[in-house]
Amino acid sequence: MWKWSVRRWAGARVNISKNRLSVINVGSRYLSTARSPLSKVRNIGIIAHIDAGKTTTTERMLYYAGISKHIGDVDTGDTITDFLEQERSRGITIQSAAISFPWRNTFAINLIDTPGHIDFTFEVIRALKVIDSCVVILDAVAGVEAQTEKVWKQSKSKPKICFINKMDRMGASFNHTVNDLINKFMRGTTTKPVLVNIPYYRKQPTSNDYVFQGVIDVVNGKRLTWNPENPDEIIVDELDGTSLEQCNRCRESMIETLTEYDEDLVQHFLEEAEGDYSKVSAQFLNASIRKLTMKNMIVPVLCGASFKNIGVQPLLDAIVNYLPSPIEAELPELNDKTVPMKYDPKVGCLVNNNKNLCIALAFKVITDPIRGKQIFIRIYSGTLNSGNTVYNSTTGEKFKLGKLLIPHAGTSQPVNILTAGQIGLLTGSTVENNISTGDTLITHSSKKDGLKSLNKKKELTLKINSIFIPPPVFGVSIEPRTLSNKKSMEEALNTLITEDPSLSISQNDETGQTVLNGMGELHLEIAKDRLVNDLKADVEFGQLMVSYKETINSETNIETYESDDGYRFSLSLLPNSDALPNCLAYPLGVNENFLIMEKNGNWDKEWKYQVSFESILNSIIASCIVGLQRGGKIANFPLYACSIKINSDWSVPPDIETPQEILKITRNLIFKALNDLKPEKYNLLEPIMNLDLTIPQSDVGTVLQDLTGARKAQILSIEDESSVSNSGASTCNSSENSNRIYIPSDAVTTIHATKDKKNTQETSSNVKKIIKAKVPLREITTYTNKLRSLSQGRGEFNIEYSDMEKVTNDRLQSILHDL
C-alpha cells in the first residue's frame, strides 16, 4: 500500500516508485499560467444540469491546485466561483465564472464554470465560444438530465470528458448513468465511451452494505481510495478479487474500443504487447485516448464524489492528459473565409501568415464595484501587451489598453502580456466605453502602436463570428418611482444589458412603457434583484408577461433619402425568408433581425472618407435596432425575423466627420417604410416551447387531454421511459458500433435491494411514459400546479425555447384581449 498527501499537486511534483513516493515542493501558490507553453494550456468549460455538482467539483479543483486554502461549500456560501451575493444566497450558479490555475507544475488550466439552469443558457453559449473542450458532469442518481442533453448538443463539436458525480449518494448508479449516456448521446453515432476509472465500493464490517470510497484506475491497474478524515490523502493499492476482475474486463473493453480507431495502438498491441491486454502500456493507452478524444471519436468517463473529495485529482489529470491545447483545438470562425489560418507549434493560431497579428474576442463584460467595468477576452492569435493601441474591428474605434489581468473568479492577477490561447481581463477607463460583448480586438503583437503595420483591408477588417443571442421569451414592465429617478434607471438598465446581452429593453412609443425582456422567470428575477440591490435603481416592476413579437409577411416599399450635401440612402424591409441566402448580413440584436448592406462602388476601392466604414455601419445598425423596436401595427410589439436592405447606391459626403446624421436618416427611412405598410401585412408571433413530460402511464390520458385541449399543444411523441437494470454487469451496443462495451455492475446495499424489490413489485402499475410536445409559452406559465394535480404529484416536466410561431386567428383576439 502507498499513502501520500496530495494537498498541493499543483505546486509539487509527485514521484512514485515501487517502494516509495517523494514530494518535492516547487513554489508559489499563484504559479503564473502566463509562463506555461501553449501545449500545456487547457481552456475548458464545466457544463451540466443544475445541481449536478459543477461548482462543488470546481471548488475541489481549486483546493487541490493550491489556489484556495480551504474547500468552498455551496451550502455555506463561501465558494470562489459563485461569488455574487445572489449566487451564494440561492446556492446556484447565475453567471459563468472564469478562473486560471496550475496543475502538475507545468500545466495551466483556464476554467469556466457555467450555470446549469435553463434561464441562463446564454452564459453557456458564450462560454462555449471561447473554450476548447468540456467537462460534462453527470449526477449518478439522476443520470442524463434535460439541461445536460441541451448543453451536449450545444457543445457538439467540442472534445469532452464525462465525470459521473455523487457516487456516494443513495440510489447512485454508475451502470445506469453510463448506459444513459450511450442511449441519449451515442446511439446512432460512431462515438463511444471509454471508462478511464470505475467505482470502488468497500463492504461495511457491521452490515451487508457497500460504501463508495474510491475508484479503480483502469489505465494503470490500481485502486485509489480517499481518507474521509483527511481530504489531502490518497491511498494507492494493488488490485485483487472482484476489483481486479472488473479492471481487467474494463481494460480489455477499452483496448477493443481504441483499436477500432487507432492503428498505432493495434500495432503496439499485436507486436510489443504480443496480444496480451495486460501488457499494453499505460503510456500508449493515454496517448491513444488523447488522440481519439480530440477527434470526438471517444468520450473518456470518470467517476467520483466531489463533495466527499473523491476522484477530483484523477479528473484533473484526465483534463491535462486527454483534452486539447489551444494549438490542437478548432480554429476560430472568421468573417473572411479567404484569410488563411493554421496552427504554429510555437505561436499558436497564425492568421494570414502574420506572427504579429493579434486577434482577441471580448466574450463577457462585468462591472466590479471597485475596478469598474472589466472585459473578459480570449486571445486567439499573437500576443496582447499592456499599453498597446488596439483596433476594435466591430466598431471601428481605436484606443489604448490599460491593465491586463488573469481572472481568479472574484479576484484577479495582474500581468503584462496575454498570449494566444489565454483567457484574460481588460480594465481601465479606455476600455469601458469601447468594448462590448462579441467585439473583435486587433493589435500588433510586438509594437505598442503598430496598427499601421497591419494590412488595412485584409487584417483590420477581420471579425470573429458573433456570439449567438437567443430571443427573450418573458418580459416585465419597469418604471422609475419618480421622474427624477428616470436617468439613474436608464443608466442601470444600460449596465445590466451590457453585462448580459440576453436581456433586452423595448419601449412602447404610444404608452411610454419600458419593458425588460429575458430568458425566463428566474432570469428576470435575478435581473430585478441586481437593478434594485446592486445598481441602486429606484424603480417599480409590473407583472411577468410573455414576450410577443410581430413580423411582416411581405416587402415594404423602397424608401429613399437624398440631399445636396452628398447623403443618399435607399432601403426596404422584408421577411428573412425572402432575403438572399448568401448576402452579406449583420445581426441586429436578439430578435433574429438582420441588416443587408449591398456593396457600393467605393467598397473595394481605397476608402476616401474621414470616418471608418465600421463607424458608418454601426450607426446604421443602431438606427435599425431602434426602428425595429418601435414595433408593428398589431400591438406595437418589437419586430422579429426581418431584414433591412440598404441598396448599393448609398453614399455619404467625403468630408463627413461623425456618423450621427446617418443614424437619423436611416432611422426615419425605416419608420416611413413600416408606417406605409398595411396592417394586414403584419403577423403576431408567440414563443413556442419544447415540453418534455415524465408521468405515470395511468395519468397519460388526462394529461394528454389537458395538453391538446386547454394548452393547444402539438404532441410529438409518447415513449416508455428509458430504463436500464442496475443488477449485474451489462454491455451496450450503439447501433453503428459492432463491439460491445463492458460496464461493471453496481454494488448492491440492503437498502438498494429492498428498493429494487419494491420497484419490481410496483412496475406493472407504475410504468413511466415520456411525452414530447410543442406548446405555446402562454399556455404553460402556471403548468406546475396543474400537472401536480393531474398526476397526483408524480409528474415532472422540463421546457426549453423552440422558436417563434405565428399566432393562429382563433387565438389572436384572446391574446390581444389579455394584454
Curated annotation (Swiss-Prot):
GO molecular function, one term: GTPase activity
Biological classification of the source: Eukaryota, Fungi, Dikarya, Ascomycota, Saccharomycotina
Entry binding sites for GTP: 48-55, 113-117, 165-168
Ranges of residues in domain tr-type G: 39-327
Family the UniProt entry places it in: Belongs to the TRAFAC class translation factor GTPase superfamily. Classic translation factor GTPase family. EF-G/EF-2 subfamily.
PANTHER family xrefs: RIBOSOME-RELEASING FACTOR 2, MITOCHONDRIAL, TRANSLATION ELONGATION FACTOR G-RELATED
Keywords: GTP-binding, Mitochondrion, Nucleotide-binding, Protein biosynthesis, Transit peptide
Function (record text): Mitochondrial GTPase that mediates the disassembly of ribosomes from messenger RNA at the termination of mitochondrial protein biosynthesis. Not involved in the GTP-dependent ribosomal translocation step during translation elongation.
Stored InterPro entries: EFG2 (IPR030851), EFG_II (IPR041095), EFG_III (IPR009022), EFG_III/V (IPR035647), EFG_V (IPR035649), EFG_V-like (IPR000640), EFTu-like_2 (IPR004161), G_TR_CS (IPR031157)
Broad class of where this protein is predominantly found: mitochondrion
Targeting presequence: 1-30
Entry's localization field: Mitochondrion
Originating gene: MEF2
GO cellular component, as recorded: mitochondrion
GO biological process, one term: mitochondrial translation
Protein name: Ribosome-releasing factor 2, mitochondrial
Pfam families: EFG_C (PF00679), EFG_III (PF14492), GTP_EFTU (PF00009), GTP_EFTU_D2 (PF03144)
